[in-house]
Amino acid sequence: AYRQTENLLYGRSFHAEAHIVHHHSDFADVAEASKHLGGIAVVSIFLTNDKQRYNPTTNRALDTILNHLKDLIEFTEEEHVCRAENRRIKRTGIYSKLGVERACRENNPNYDADSPDGDPSNKCQLHKKARGCGDPIENVTFNPNDLLSSIPTYLTFEGGLTTPPCSESVIWIVAEHPAYISNKNIEYMNKLKSRIVNQTISDFGNLRPLHDPAERDVFRIIYGRYPPRREEDDERGDGRHDLRDDDDNYDDDDYYNDDYSNDDYYDDDYYYDDYDDDTDDDHKDDGRRDRGGGDDKGGRGKGDDRGGRDNGDNRTGRGNRNDRGRRGNGDDSGGRGNGNNRDGRGNGDSRDRNNGNGNGRENGGVRGNGNDRDGRRDNGNGGDNGTRRGNGDDRGGRRNEDRGENRRGKDDQERESEDGRRRRRRFNGRRRRRGRGDDKGDDKGDDN
């Protein structure tokens, strides 16, 4: 039977619970931070060997720590390494104290008898290290990220310390998925003793009633991904990397398997829906940008005629070439620059803001001109009535003209003249006119 962990998960206890304690950087240490609301954050991970019910995952970082339990020195009252420290504490008269002092001295040798009586929390310096008492185990190295649960789902709430003075200063972040602990390490933990009164800690356990939530909210948080892992970590195959898909995210289907989603442990209400919506095709014509992989898409892509950021020579966004769509120093810059043919502010010959070649406002909300550019538009485009910018058969986004001849960024000699030929093209099942150089840009369509 379990001896009850500090926290319970949906009414269930586990063999052990690991706490990763952090304090706010505004405070020097945990002892000082514990006196301030939100001064401490504790990441809690349950430990169990019950593979059938919980399917716990191996946590190599925790194993690195737990495997040193066997290195702890088993002491007797006369020979243990903390004997001198304990004698010094006994001479302070702590054992005769009552109330808060008694609760502190039974759990901690660092009781501060000289602290002001007005602040009981100062009397119990639980987080200060005892001096001259044993040697620390050194050269224990691991990646702190590996301490986290293999499945990034957590429950978080505001609470307090689980040891005196139990200050209400902790932000708890409790992992929903437990980690595995071996039977041998459970045995080692059950044999741990208090170094002051030489009592086996496991004899007391944590069989205490849970605190009332006191109208505090408990939030369930699902993180989409962890920070990038080192290449050598991925080679280990420790369970966490195995859950990732090709784009380094966790798929919903990978969170739980049949063994872990036991009906007596999780209700269906705790599951969450698949939120990988395929919305690209649904929003190509409603004013949104889509990410696409084809030639004539209105979103970001790597093709020739895409309406987003392009890898070609004539970019509509920021680029490293001469034909940029925003700020640039090239000849055919689309934004602010020193080039000749700009569609924004500049010193060029054909500005669309200052009576350029047949410029005017269009219903699409951009300013345009005939031969050169009409806002963030291509040759001879008129504006659509929507919020998108587009031309011809291509889709709405920031677009280029017909793969080359009439793209933004082409020289003047390659562009069509103001009196260029008219043509009609079908777009979204209806005819639209595309603006000509001498037409006003406030027509719903435009001629070329």
From Swiss-Prot:
<feature type="domain" description="Alpha-carbonic anhydrase">
    <location>
        <begin position="1"/>
        <end position="222"/>
    </location>
</feature>
<feature type="region of interest" description="Disordered">
    <location>
        <begin position="229"/>
        <end position="448"/>
    </location>
</feature>
<feature type="compositionally biased region" description="Basic residues">
    <location>
        <begin position="422"/>
        <end position="435"/>
    </location>
</feature>
<comment type="similarity">
    <text>Belongs to the alpha-carbonic anhydrase family.</text>
</comment>
<dbReference type="Pfam" id="PF00194">
    <property type="entry name" value="Carb_anhydrase"/>
</dbReference>
<dbReference type="InterPro" id="IPR001148">
    <property type="entry name" value="CA_dom"/>
</dbReference>
<feature type="glycosylation site" description="N-linked (GlcNAc...) asparagine">
    <location>
        <position position="314"/>
    </location>
</feature>
<keyword id="KW-0964">Secreted</keyword>
<feature type="compositionally biased region" description="Basic and acidic residues">
    <location>
        <begin position="386"/>
        <end position="421"/>
    </location>
</feature>
<feature type="compositionally biased region" description="Basic and acidic residues">
    <location>
        <begin position="370"/>
        <end position="379"/>
    </location>
</feature>
<dbReference type="GO" id="GO:0008270">
    <property type="term" value="F:zinc ion binding"/>
</dbReference>
<feature type="compositionally biased region" description="Basic and acidic residues">
    <location>
        <begin position="436"/>
        <end position="448"/>
    </location>
</feature>
<protein>
    <recommendedName>
        <fullName>Putative carbonic anhydrase 2</fullName>
        <ecNumber>4.2.1.1</ecNumber>
    </recommendedName>
</protein>
<dbReference type="InterPro" id="IPR023561">
    <property type="entry name" value="Carbonic_anhydrase_a-class"/>
</dbReference>
<comment type="function">
    <text>Reversible hydration of carbon dioxide.</text>
</comment>
<keyword id="KW-0456">Lyase</keyword>
<feature type="compositionally biased region" description="Basic and acidic residues">
    <location>
        <begin position="281"/>
        <end position="334"/>
    </location>
</feature>
<dbReference type="GO" id="GO:0005576">
    <property type="term" value="C:extracellular region"/>
</dbReference>
<feature type="glycosylation site" description="N-linked (GlcNAc...) asparagine">
    <location>
        <position position="198"/>
    </location>
</feature>
<feature type="compositionally biased region" description="Acidic residues">
    <location>
        <begin position="245"/>
        <end position="280"/>
    </location>
</feature>
<keyword id="KW-0862">Zinc</keyword>
<keyword id="KW-0479">Metal-binding</keyword>
<keyword id="KW-0325">Glycoprotein</keyword>
<feature type="binding site">
    <location>
        <position position="19"/>
    </location>
    <ligand>
        <name>Zn(2+)</name>
    </ligand>
</feature>
<feature type="compositionally biased region" description="Basic and acidic residues">
    <location>
        <begin position="342"/>
        <end position="354"/>
    </location>
</feature>
<feature type="compositionally biased region" description="Gly residues">
    <location>
        <begin position="357"/>
        <end position="368"/>
    </location>
</feature>
<feature type="glycosylation site" description="N-linked (GlcNAc...) asparagine">
    <location>
        <position position="139"/>
    </location>
</feature>
<dbReference type="GO" id="GO:0004089">
    <property type="term" value="F:carbonate dehydratase activity"/>
</dbReference>
<dbReference type="InterPro" id="IPR036398">
    <property type="entry name" value="CA_dom_sf"/>
</dbReference>
<feature type="glycosylation site" description="N-linked (GlcNAc...) asparagine">
    <location>
        <position position="385"/>
    </location>
</feature>
